[in-house]
Amino acid sequence: MVGEMPALKDLVLQLEPSVLDLDLYCYEEVPPDDIEEELVSPQQPYAVVASCAYCEKLVRLTVLADHSAIRQLEELLLRSLNIVCPLCTLQRQ
């Protein structure tokens, strides 16, 4: 643009591509969901503390699981799964 005021002749009316022959296709392969979960969440040890269903004493155990399995265990413990301590197990046999 020349001068203080823009003139019509100063405007560019042709659009030219800035990059020629740009390949926008992504050649990356995405793994299936089940493989991706294994890669993202490896099994780790978790300490679980729950009370005995009979005597209410604390029962401590360690499990090896991934994040989704721990969530499922938590749901089971909150709903229908009860843990029994070793002493109550021996007394009830």
UniProtKB/Swiss-Prot annotation:
Domain of life according to the entry: Viruses
Keyword field: Activator, DNA-binding, Early protein, G1/S host cell cycle checkpoint dysregulation by virus, Host cytoplasm, Host nucleus, Host-virus interaction, Inhibition of host innate immune response by virus, Inhibition of host interferon signaling pathway by virus, Interferon antiviral system evasion, Metal-binding, Modulation of host cell cycle by virus, Oncogene, Transcription, Transcription regulation, Viral immunoevasion, Zinc, Zinc-finger
Stored Gene3D superfamilies: 3.30.160.330
Principal cellular location given in the protein's record: host cell
Post-translational modification: Highly phosphorylated.
Region of interest (E7 terminal domain), residue spans: 1-41
Molecular function (Gene Ontology), one example: zinc ion binding
Localisation: Host cytoplasm; Host nucleus
Keyword field contains Phosphoprotein: no
Start and end residues, zinc fingers (unnamed): 52-88
Positions occupied by motif LXCXE motif: 24-28
Domain notes: The E7 terminal domain is an intrinsically disordered domain, whose flexibility and conformational transitions confer target adaptability to the oncoprotein. It allows adaptation to a variety of protein targets and exposes the PEST degradation sequence that regulates its turnover in the cell.
HAMAP family noted in UniProt: PPV_E7
Subunit structure: Homodimer. Homooligomer. Interacts with host RB1; this interaction induces dissociation of RB1-E2F1 complex thereby disrupting RB1 activity. Interacts with host EP300; this interaction represses EP300 transcriptional activity. Interacts with protein E2; this interaction inhibits E7 oncogenic activity. Interacts with host TMEM173/STING; this interaction impairs the ability of TMEM173/STING to sense cytosolic DNA and promote the production of type I interferon (IFN-alpha and IFN-beta).
Protein name: Protein E7
Organism listed in the record: Human papillomavirus type 1 (Human papillomavirus type 1a)
Organism taxonomic ancestry: Viruses, Monodnaviria, Shotokuvirae, Cossaviricota, Papovaviricetes
